[in-house]
């Protein structure tokens, strides 16, 4: 079965599970870094929102031997777990006074998103783009967001500079930074704790995680006023920032003999094998100078003596 045949079959079988009051649609969804995914939405009558269920990975599961029947059952489970109980009043979005407290920012890679950036307000920072979104809701079931586009600014009659001012105030307040050692964090998230020898090894090469409390676009924490300086003072040294994804940075205190070429090679390898394409932030490290209070890109070979 080809991919297009798979999409059609999924849509038909999902439709057979519901009554005629439900609308089943397939959409091409433009994601970060130029990635386009195929999303399935199931709209109940009288409701204007639905979770988007992406089908690309399901096709990989089908190719690996999973039956269409089991895929359909899983999609139904996902929908039932996340389906909305009521509509969202989108009329409020036309009035900026209703929206301004919900405006937040996030970081994406500049070059990988040049086409998208033609349509949205943004500011360049190093090799990143600072872009904006409206956080409609956030819960354990997921987050509802709207990417802010240039057309929004036109009917709001608001400048990109004003947007940034609101986001700079809102984002740290609504998504507070979370900075903690990597291994204790992993132990909290994993069902089984890491062995003691792993903890001892980690203490010799300490790694920290910088994200936000919601783990949502947490890489943007590097924009929070005075945050990097506060981290440098806490560590009492300069440090590297390793872009783990659009949701977090890893912080590595400067160690003698650290080779940037090796560090960047590791980042590239992890991005290629472990991180979803749409969640990649960058393929090299960054350096924060405690004395200069300055963040710089470290894309070239360099060794710290």
Language model feature labels by segment:
Residues 2-10, 67, 71, 159, ...:
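Short amphipathic alpha-helical segments
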Residues 213-305:
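C-terminal structured domains
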Residues 22, 112-116, 213-221:
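Short charge-dense sequence patches
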Residues 27-209:
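Charged, alpha-helical interface segments at or near domain boundaries
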């Amino acid at each position: 079965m080809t991919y297009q045949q798979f999409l059609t079959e999924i849509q038909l079988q999902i439709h057979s599970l519901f009554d005629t009051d439900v609308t089943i649609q397939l959409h091409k969804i433009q994601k970060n870094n130029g990635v386009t995914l195929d999303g399935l939405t199931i709209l109940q009558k009288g409701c204007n929102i639905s979770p988007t269920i992406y089908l690309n990975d399901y096709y990989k599961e089908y190719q690996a031997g999973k039956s269409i029947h089991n895929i359909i059952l899983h999609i139904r489970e996902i929908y039932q777990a996340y389906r909305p109980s009521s509509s969202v009043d989108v009329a409020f979005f036309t009035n900026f006074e209703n929206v301004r407290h919900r405006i937040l920012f996030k970081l994406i890679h500049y070059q990988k998103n040049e086409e998208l950036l033609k349509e949205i307000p943004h500011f360049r920072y190093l090799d990143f783009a600072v872009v904006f979104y409206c956080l409609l809701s956030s819960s354990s079931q997921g987050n509802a967001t709207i990417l802010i586009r240039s057309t929004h600014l036109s009917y709001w009659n608001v400048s990109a500079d004003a947007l940034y001012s609101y986001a700079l105030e809102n984002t740290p307040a609504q998504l507070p930074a979370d900075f903690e050692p990597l291994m204790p964090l992993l132990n909290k998230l994993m069902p089984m704790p890491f062995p003691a020898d792993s903890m001892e090894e980690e203490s010799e090469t300490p790694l920290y995680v910088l994200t936000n409390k919601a783990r949502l676009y947490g890489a943007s924490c590097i924009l929070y006023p005075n945050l990097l300086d506060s981290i440098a003072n806490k560590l009492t040294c300069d440090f590297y920032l390793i872009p783990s994804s659009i949701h977090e940075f890893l912080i590595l205190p400067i160690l003698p003999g650290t080779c940037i070429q090796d560090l960047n090679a590791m980042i590239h390898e992890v991005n290629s094998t472990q991180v979803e394409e749409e969640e990649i932030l960058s393929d090299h490290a960054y350096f924060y100078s405690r004395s200069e209070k300055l963040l710089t890109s470290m894309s070239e070979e360099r060794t710290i003596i």
